[in-house]
Regions:
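Feature for soluble, non-membrane regions of globular proteins
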Residues: 1-205
């Protein structure tokens, strides 16, 4: 299996002014492309070409070679996390969660407003490089978490599936926002497509 970058359903300039064209070109065209290339090389070396990325990331402890395990973790996480990140954004305005996702959000977080605030605080509170995630278990319960570097919930518990990812590595925002991570995180929600997040949620159950 050759892992490929997610195909964007929008042009690099479509997320302006919230995420600018240069950031998109660099982030998707260079950083994400590099993670994808390096992950494929590590997968081939490990003899895991018959496994899905989810299977690989949730069973990293089975890889005995430390250097190879680190490469799979770092590049596989970078590949998977970026695929999710780029796939849940769009230029569409005013998207809404499905009824099922809305009910789950209200049940597990009290309201959409509470969830957004929690995710923003997680993204801002991540020291250094990392991610904030909204994930679901197989029963549909939602979890808001953060992870360092290219880690994600697959690696940390092996059960919960991320349905939304916020990249807070500096390469995701520094060209446009410089050190103003908070402005970037706030504006991320202006290009977040809740319809896509809802589809991810449905696939978890």
């Amino acid at each position: 299996m050759n892992f490929e970058q997610v195909k964007l359903e929008y042009d690099f300039y479509d997320l302006e002014p919230y995420i600018d064209t240069l950031t998109m070109e660099t982030h998707y065209g260079k950083h994400h492309a590099s993670y994808t290339k390096n992950f494929n090389e590590a997968v081939e070396k490990a003899g895991l070409s018959n496994k899905s990325v989810e299977e690989i990331l949730s069973t990293l402890s089975l890889v005995s070679d430390q250097a190879l395990r680190d490469s799979l973790q770092n590049n596989g996480g970078g590949y998977y996390n970026h695929n999710l990140y780029f796939s849940v954004m769009s230029p569409k305005k005013g998207t809404k969660p499905s009824l099922a996702l809305e009910e789950a959000i209200n049940r597990d977080f009290g309201s959409m407003e509470n969830l957004v605030e929690i995710l923003q605080n997680l993204a801002l509170g991540q020291f250094g490089s990392g991610w904030a995630f909204l994930s679901s278990d197989k029963e549909g319960k939602l979890y808001a978490t953060k992870s360092a570097n290219q880690n994600n919930p697959f690696m940390e518990d092996g059960h919960n599936t991320p349905i939304l990812a916020i990249d807070v590595w500096e390469h995701a925002y520094y060209l446009q926002y410089k050190n103003l991570r908070g402005d970037y995180v706030k504006n991320f929600f202006k290009v977040l497509d809740w319809e896509k997040v809802s589809k991810n949620y449905e696939h978890c159950k």
